[in-house]
A protein has these predicted regions:
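Short coil/turn segments at secondary-structure boundaries
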Residues: 93-96, 221-224, 311-317
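Short amphipathic alpha-helical "interface-anchor" segments enriched in bulky aromatics
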Residues: 291-323
């Protein structure tokens, strides 16, 4: 908490006159703590400050080394504070804090795109899509790029890779990121990757499908998992082959050998049973990776959907981006 408070204290204060009753770092401290507790509106922040008034003042006294004698700030106070806040300065402060946490808890970076369906497009070319780099370990967005069309996602992924530090980290991207240039960039920056393969890479997909057959059964490592909750039972079976390029002479690869630092290939079979509807669905997907640990790949593929379940859900439902 000391670290985030010190960084929030660097945000410039735009307020003037009688609007300076409450220090800006105190208002930001309440807002940050409130958001982490599920409070999202100005009225929510006022309520949160009232509910935890003594604790917040004691925390502020410990962090800022000064005491507050005022009553709790109103919703108008929070509104005025944030209306004039420099978004770039606030974003830079947040990134500074995020990087300190990222060095400790970062390793898995999920990259995924999202359409902001609730935006009112005054211009057909206005930016209504985002591509985000999300740190699964701390449930926070590391960086994002806004684009006007979903077809520009590939370039947006490349742009993200230019600005984020991927060294020593593992990147998971869906099929849109399975491009030779993207893999080359990840490897050149000393990162690892797990990428989904679909029909946008037909040659690679065909060669992957040909490997998971009885001919290679002795080479296949199987990792299984089961989860139950929300009225569903999901089973996952990951079949993995390590160092597939050792079969290059017999297979005469045309596509598989173009992926830099390829160490493993994977077939994931997911079965989901809906207890209420009594319906079972089956999905098969393929992946390429620079990792050689099947259990780790299985876990990271599962964790990749944290960007959908945690980030996108919050943006859509709590912040109303799809309204």
């Amino acid at each position: 908490m000391e670290n985030i408070f010190q960084i929030l204290s660097t945000v410039p204060d735009h307020r003037r006159g009688n609007h300076l009753i409450y220090p800006i770092d105190y208002l930001l401290l309440i807002s940050f703590s409130g958001i982490m507790s599920g409070f999202t509106t100005w009225s929510d922040f006022e309520l949160y400050a009232q509910l935890h008034e003594e604790d917040l003042k004691m925390l502020y006294k410990r962090l800022a080394k000064r005491e507050l004698m005022n009553y709790t700030p109103s919703h108008d106070t929070f509104s005025y504070c944030f209306r004039g806040l420099d978004p770039k300065a606030f974003q830079e402060a947040f990134k500074s804090w995020l990087l300190t946490v990222y060095e400790i808890l970062g390793e898995h970076i999920c990259i995924d795109g999202k359409t902001i369906r609730g935006v009112r497009k005054l211009d057909p070319d206005s930016d209504s899509h985002t591509v985000t780099a999300y740190i699964a370990g701390i449930r926070a967005s590391l960086n994002q790029v806004f684009i006007s069309k979903k077809s520009n996602e590939i370039n947006a992924v490349k742009e993200l890779l230019d600005v984020i530090d991927v060294e020593g980290n593992i990147l998971t991207i869906d099929a849109i990121g399975t491009q030779k240039e993207i893999v080359d960039k990840i490897v050149s920056k000393k990162g690892e990757y797990i990428l989904q393969v679909k029909s946008n890479q037909p040659g690679t997909l065909l060669e992957l499908e040909e490997h998971f057959c009885s001919f290679y059964k002795d080479e296949i490592i199987t990792t299984e998992g089961l989860e139950s909750g929300h009225g569903r039972v999901e089973t996952r079976k990951l079949e993995s082959i390590m160092n597939p390029l050792r079969f290059a002479e017999t297979e005469k690869y045309r596509d598989l050998n173009k992926w830099a630092n390829l160490q493993s290939i994977h077939k994931l079979t997911s079965s989901r049973y809906d207890k209420k509807k009594k319906v079972e669905s089956l999905q098969v997907s393929y992946y390429i990776s620079s990792l050689s640990n099947a259990e780790k790949v299985c876990k990271l593929i599962r964790n990749h959907w944290a960007i959908e379940n945690n980030l996108h859900y919050c943006l859509d439902v709590i912040l109303g981006e799809d309204r």
